[in-house]
């Protein structure tokens, strides 16, 4: 198969153009030397640089906006090795936004965030995608977060695609149990979006918890 982005085959794009159109946020991001948050986000402007080219005022404005978009403006002057994992994740996402991509790929972007921060980040990404007309693809094991925010879900199992579609179509108990190998229940809220929970112990034949009185 082939992948097209903005009318171009991605395999035919040179490295610089590909970096301008596609941004990636990995699970873990390492640094060779300490940087302040704004300096780290400024690296997202690298695909637009030229030989002997210094950062422009536009670059700094884009960095400032990217930090603001993920709620990380207060971290701008903080050193990356001195902030928490959740704060660092926000800054890493801001660097990707500074690339101003058409396609944003995120691998477990909520990994180090508490539940409130997860919701806030995903709400921001959904709003930004709508406002800026770019596509966000998120790899996640957070079933309920995916159901709450995704327009389309791709359910993968052992390297194969089992089903693609809106969460309400993809979230079928038998499919989810096949993938996650756990007894699950799927319920649908008033908005039609599914919610997944683990089936009760007694329902799956485990009885009461031996550590607790019956």
Show the residue positions of the predicted features.
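Conserved ABC transporter NBD signature motif
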Residues: 1-9, 18
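Conserved catalytic motifs of ABC-family nucleotide-binding domains
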Residues: 100
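Conserved ABC ATPase signature
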Residues: 53, 79-83, 87
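Conserved ABC ATPase "signature" region
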Residues: 42, 57-75
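Catalytic Walker B motif of ABC-type/P-loop ATPase nucleotide-binding domains
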Residues: 104-108
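ABC ATPase nucleotide-binding domains
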Residues: 179-214
């Amino acid at each position: 198969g082939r992948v097209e982005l903005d009318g171009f085959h991605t395999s035919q794009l040179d490295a610089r153009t590909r970096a301008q159109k596609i941004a990636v946020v990995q699970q873990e991001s390492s640094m060779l030397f300490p940087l302040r948050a704004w300096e780290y986000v400024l690296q997202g402007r690298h695909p637009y640089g030229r030989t002997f080219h210094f950062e422009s005022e536009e670059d700094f404005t884009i960095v400032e906006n990217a930090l603001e978009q993920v709620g990380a403006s207060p971290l701008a002057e903080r050193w990356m090795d001195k902030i928490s994992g959740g704060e660092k994740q926000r800054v890493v996402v801001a660097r990707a936004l500074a690339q101003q991509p058409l396609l944003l790929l995120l691998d477990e972007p909520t990994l180090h965030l508490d539940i409130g921060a997860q919701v806030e980040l995903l709400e921001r990404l959904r709003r930004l995608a709508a406002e800026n007309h770019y596509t966000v693809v998120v790899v996640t094991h957070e079933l309920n977060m995916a159901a709450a925010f995704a327009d389309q879900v791709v359910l993968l199992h052992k390297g194969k695609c089992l089903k693609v579609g809106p969460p309400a179509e993809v979230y079928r108990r038998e499919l989810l149990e096949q993938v996650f190998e756990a007894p699950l229940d799927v319920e649908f809220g008033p908005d039609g979006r599914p919610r997944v929970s683990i089936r009760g112990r007694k329902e799956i034949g485990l009885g009461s918890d031996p550590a607790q009185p019956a």
